[in-house]
């Protein structure tokens, strides 16, 4: 059981490691063709521009190669230098760099470190009423992403909306999509909620997803982002058709939709005599007479002695004798060249002026302070009193947001070649799913077909994780060990199995004179020491002789203990018969007739 449990744990470990490299978020068919077959697959696929099935508010595939209906912004950002305030970032319509499908094009952000703004009007405004909102589009960070976003804005349906003036402060209803800067990976879902009393809009941020978003920014694959808002005030955020975030518009956004009923009174002030001190010095405490505050915390160690070999006149650092002035060193511009300093090899023990080390002063007590006691006048931490919130309201249906009538991308990025494709806004998730299957589904088909084999993925994984070689070797040995354990199981002998219980040897009849002679010889042997080698040979000879007479096999210590236990049991059961044998011996002991004696066979122990 221990053997099988070990390999079971090893198998589970390998599965957990392998899961790190497998995309378990998307359930797609595995393709195991080689590179030639995948090239043929890409050329054989007949791409067809997706067509919406059902009511839609906006669709865009960019397959026509033209930006028909899209408006480039001519606005300028406020509060920044004029040189960088212009939205002069470049957009192009191109196919994907990798895993391209002939005829499938997308909108590509082409400029680095520039502001980009482009927008398009919906076929009809979306009004939040009794139908869900479904927003979906594709993003591919073809060169990865250092710092930048790929989110969209749904621009509010206002009278002053002008797409040529679209900039960062243009009023929007929803902001949705991926964003990254540094190591902060985000998937925004922000909506602007209107205060019913003051009319002021406030941004509400959905809680962050519970999944690691890093791979969606770094794997250079096309990913599908979907937002679903329902009339029951719930929402879902999906990546590649997998829900990564969901919740309630009333409970899972920050700040909350409804303000608190009571707020702190801004006019309330803390009284001057309010005592917030929980502890105060004990006024009745007196400093001890022997308390010396003049002693320093550390003193010179008077017992320290300068180590032998300490060089007082040697510098601790010296110029590097092996250093050479760079060939391009210009003394007029760079100044006089000096060799870098290195540790003085002669200062192995120490160099420079020696001074004894400092140690803690055992007499140090520091400045005396009275002990702290509970404050009898403690009133607690003061806080302003609560008053009814004059701006309080209760909105139990936050889904009813401001309608929108345009979609825009207002982005700044330090990385170029961000690919956008297949925008759709509708009210039915099934319509968006069909749209995704005809567009994004084709891209995933090609990407999976061009994926390297499992073997190549495992080998490439070891470049960053060398410890995986150990897992691979153990995993390779797993089936061999299991087959061996089942085909050639280890034979385990049962305890006491094949133990032969043999009868005690009964010596040949001996005369009384012969017994007396043996007794004399034993006494003589005890009185005269015998050479160890002769004794060993004699004992070996006796054992060999007895083995020839009786049993040819030797018995283990456990078998001897069993035999002795049975002999002791037999003694108690056969006490009557032994008494009779003794009486028979005594009756024949007066003469030289033969007698019988029972002996226990000596067994050599190895």
From Swiss-Prot:
InterPro entries: Calret/calnex (IPR001580), Calret/calnex_CS (IPR018124), Calreticulin/calnexin_P_dom_sf (IPR009033), ConA-like_dom_sf (IPR013320). The keyword Acetylation applies. Residues 313-346 are annotated as: Interaction with PPIB. Residues 265-275, 545-567 have a biased composition (Acidic residues). The chain crosses the membrane at residues 467-487. Residues 597-606 have a biased composition (Basic residues). Residues 488-606 are cytoplasmic. It is a single-pass type I membrane protein. GO terms for molecular function: calcium ion binding; protein folding chaperone; unfolded protein binding. Residues 255-308, 518-606 are annotated as: Disordered. It is found in: Endoplasmic reticulum membrane. One of its GO terms (cellular component) is endoplasmic reticulum membrane. Keywords: Acetylation, Calcium, Chaperone, Disulfide bond, Endoplasmic reticulum, Membrane, Phosphoprotein, Repeat, Signal, Transmembrane, Transmembrane helix. The modification Phosphoserine is found at residues 556, 572, 575, 577, 587, 590, 597. Residues 1-19 form the signal peptide. Residues 518-544, 568-579 have a biased composition (Basic and acidic residues). The modification N6-acetyllysine is found at residue 124. Belongs to the calreticulin family. Functions during spermatogenesis as a chaperone for a range of client proteins that are important for sperm adhesion onto the egg zona pellucida and for subsequent penetration of the zona pellucida. Required for normal sperm migration from the uterus into the oviduct. Required for normal male fertility. Binds calcium ions. This is Calmegin.
């Amino acid at each position: 059981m221990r053997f099988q449990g070990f390999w079971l744990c090893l198998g589970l470990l390998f599965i957990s490691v392998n899961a790190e490299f497998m995309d378990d978020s998307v359930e797609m068919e595995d393709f195991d063709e080689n590179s030639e077959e995948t090239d043929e697959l890409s050329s054989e696929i007949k791409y067809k521009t997706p067509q919406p099935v059902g009511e839609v508010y906006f669709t865009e595939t960019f397959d026509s190669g033209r930006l028909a209906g899209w408006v480039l912004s001519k606005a300028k950002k406020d509060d920044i230098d004029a040189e960088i305030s212009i939205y002069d970032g470049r957009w192009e319509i191109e196919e994907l760099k990798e895993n391209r499908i002939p005829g499938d094009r997308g909108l590509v952000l082409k400029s680095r470190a520039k502001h980009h703004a482009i927008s398009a009007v919906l076929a009809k405004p979306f009004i939040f009423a009794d139908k869900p909102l479904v927003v979906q589009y594709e993003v591919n960070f073809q060169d990865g992403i250092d710092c930048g976003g790929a989110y969209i804005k749904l621009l509010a349906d206002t009278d002053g909306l002008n797409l040529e003036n679209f900039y960062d402060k243009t009023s929007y209803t929803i902001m949705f999509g991926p964003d990254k800067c540094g190591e902060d990976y985000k998937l925004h879902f922000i909506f602007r909620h209107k205060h019913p009393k003051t009319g002021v809009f406030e941004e509400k941020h959905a809680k962050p997803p519970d999944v690691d978003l890093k791979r969606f920014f770094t794997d250079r694959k096309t990913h599908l982002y979907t937002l679903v808002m329902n009339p029951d005030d719930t929402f879902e955020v999906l990546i590649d058709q997998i829900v990564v975030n969901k919740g309630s518009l009333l409970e899972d956004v920050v700040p909350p939709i409804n303000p608190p009923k009571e707020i702190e009174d801004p006019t309330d002030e803390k009284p001057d005599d309010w005592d917030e001190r929980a502890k105060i010095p004990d006024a009745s405490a007196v400093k001890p007479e022997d308390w010396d505050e003049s002693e320093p915390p550390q003193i010179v160690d008077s017992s320290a002695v300068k180590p032998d070999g300490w060089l007082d006149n040697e510098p601790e650092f010296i110029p590097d004798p092996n250093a050479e002035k760079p060939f391009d060193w210009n003394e007029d511009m760079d100044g006089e060249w000096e060799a870098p300093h290195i540790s003085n090899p002669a200062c192995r023990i120490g160099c420079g002026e020696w001074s004894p080390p400092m140690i803690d002063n055992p007499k140090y007590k520091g400045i005396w302070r009275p002990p702290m006691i509970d404050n009898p006048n403690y009133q607690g931490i003061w806080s302003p009193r609560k008053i009814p919130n004059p701006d309080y309201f209760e909105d139990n249906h936050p889904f009813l947001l401001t309608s929108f009538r345009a979609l825009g991308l207002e982005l700044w990025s330090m990385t170029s070649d961000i690919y956008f494709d297949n925008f759709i806004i509708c009210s039915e998730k099934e319509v968006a799913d069909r749209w995704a299957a005809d567009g994004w589904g084709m891209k995933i088909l090609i990407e999976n077909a061009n994926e390297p084999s499992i073997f190549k993925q495992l080998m490439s994984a070891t470049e960053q994780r060398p410890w995986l070689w150990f897992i691979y070797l153990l995993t390779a040995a797993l089936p061999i060990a299991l087959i061996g354990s089942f085909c050639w199981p280890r034979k385990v002998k049962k305890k006491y199995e094949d133990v032969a219980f043999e009868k005690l040897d009964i010596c040949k009849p001996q005369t009384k004179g012969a017994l007396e002679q043996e007794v004399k010889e034993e006494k003589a042997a005890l009185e005269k020491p015998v050479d160890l080698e002769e004794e060993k040979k004699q004992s070996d000879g006796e054992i060999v002789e007895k083995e020839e007479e009786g049993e040819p096999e030797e018995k283990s210590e456990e078998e001897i203990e069993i035999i002795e236990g049975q002999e002791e049991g037999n003694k108690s059961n056969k006490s009557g018969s032994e008494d009779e044998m003794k009486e028979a011996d005594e009756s024949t002991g007066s003469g030289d007739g033969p007698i019988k004696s029972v002996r226990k066979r000596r067994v050599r122990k190895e």
